[in-house]
């Protein structure tokens, strides 16, 4: 059975996935996979093609480079705070990442008023043009399966079944928490709409002003990839 430490870890990992989903909803709204963000999309070239094969033909985006890198880095924090690195530990860390990625992604749909569980289905999500099994895209099953394989390899490397057993119990705990979130999601949807009701937003009374050179980020046309010279910086006032 799962002990108190593992229960706490499962709750913390779920809370992390929940917050990742929540912040992405605030950033993206109903337009997932960075569809309307000022980032780049890459499907061509060796990197774009390989990524597409591994990720169900989805484009690699600048947003997702960092969105995926941050959880991987955070999960490795224990190794620089005194926990000894081992192959079994690394495999366990990667197993946790793939589970978190699935939970985080699904919660984005559960909590997002533009989708909800009812509207999360085949043909309604352009970046999930992959086979679906029941109500879920194949990517979710492959992500969970990969995490179990990694946990099994961790157990084999450690010569101890506990990494696999612990991982399986974590999956059970996360499944229960996801189910509870599905049931309670209407409360989040209500709060989401409440914060956006007419007259509630204080953007119009908040003093804002544009950046010095918004065109330097992206003007919607061909990007200027030439390096800035000293004269360019002086003319722009930077």
Pin down the residues of each PLM region.
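Aromatic-rich, lipid-facing transmembrane alpha helices and their immediate juxtamembrane interface loops
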Residues: 1-225
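A cross-taxon signal for low-complexity, glycine/charged-rich
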Residues: 230-231, 235
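Compact soluble domain cores
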Residues: 238
